[in-house]
A protein has these predicted regions:
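Class I Rossmann-like S-adenosyl-L-methionine
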Residues: 1-135
Length: 135
């Protein structure tokens, strides 16, 4: 299970560099994959799909988040915004990931990044999205 948390954390790092640093996603992702060659083929595929898919569908994910969060996406802290984007992408597009895992791992990631006080917020938003999607 720690590998999946690590993989999600790496995906968050890619997303942060792209959205906040203005880097190109394919270059950041390639760099991360080269740096973490110990990842299994399955983990590399999960990381790639999660990072690229979230970036490709960012506008749609933000629209969904705005519908379910009292705090608008533009007002959220960048780390929380990107954790929620990753979570919604997993709920909507990654059928192999159970809704409970997507929510719980997002909360763990928020706590690990120093936002323990926002764990309930992350959980509430993602659970609401999951219910709406029929999870």
């Amino acid at each position: 299970m720690t590998d999946s948390v690590n993989t999600r954390e790496l995906a968050l790092g890619v997303l942060m560099e792209v959205t906040e640093g203005g880097s190109y996603s394919h270059l950041v992702l390639r760099s991360v994959l080269e740096k973490h060659q110990y990842l299994t083929k399955q983990e590399r595929a999960f990381l790639t799909r999660l990072a690229e898919g979230t970036i490709q569908r960012m506008l749609e994910l933000d629209y969904i988040l705005d519908r379910f969060s009292k705090v608008k996406v533009k007002k959220m802290k960048p780390v929380i915004r990107n954790i929620l984007r990753l979570g919604v992408y997993q709920l909507k597009y990654m059928d192999a990931v159970p809704a409970s895992a997507a929510c719980n791992e997002a909360v763990k990631l928020a706590k690990k990044k120093g936002f323990a006080s926002l764990g309930g917020f992350v959980n509430g938003v993602l659970r609401s999205v999951g219910r709406d999607l029929g999870e």
